[in-house]
């Protein structure tokens, strides 16, 4: 009985550790913790068709300002 409890405890710890490692609660990229910036970067990413535009917009202010220029002609 004690050995089966030990096995269950070890399995529980392994599952808990893996769950924390592969959690989907990632922190926002760069400055996209701000809702407004994240929303604008998503719109520009969709319009540009460039794969990494969203992350570039979130990290670099220059890309963010180009995004603003693209949205407000």
From Swiss-Prot:
Post-translational modification: Contains 3 disulfide bonds.
Expression tissues: Expressed by the venom gland.
Name under which the protein is recorded: U-scoloptoxin(03)-Ssd1b
Gene Ontology, cellular component aspect: extracellular region
Signal peptide feature range: 1-23
Location of the protein in the cell: Secreted
Protein family: Belongs to the scoloptoxin-03 family.
Upper taxonomic lineage: Eukaryota, Metazoa, Ecdysozoa, Arthropoda, Myriapoda
A single MF term (Gene Ontology): toxin activity
Transmembrane segments: none
Keywords attached to this entry: Disulfide bond, Secreted, Signal, Toxin
């Amino acid at each position: 009985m004690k050995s089966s409890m030990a096995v269950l405890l070890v399995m529980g710890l392994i599952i808990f550790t893996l769950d924390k490692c592969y959690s989907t609660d990632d922190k926002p990229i760069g400055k996209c913790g701000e809702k407004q910036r994240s929303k604008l970067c998503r719109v520009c990413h969709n319009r540009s068709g460039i794969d990494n535009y969203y992350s570039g917009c979130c990290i670099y202010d220059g890309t963010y300002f180009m995004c603003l220029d693209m949205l407000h002609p």
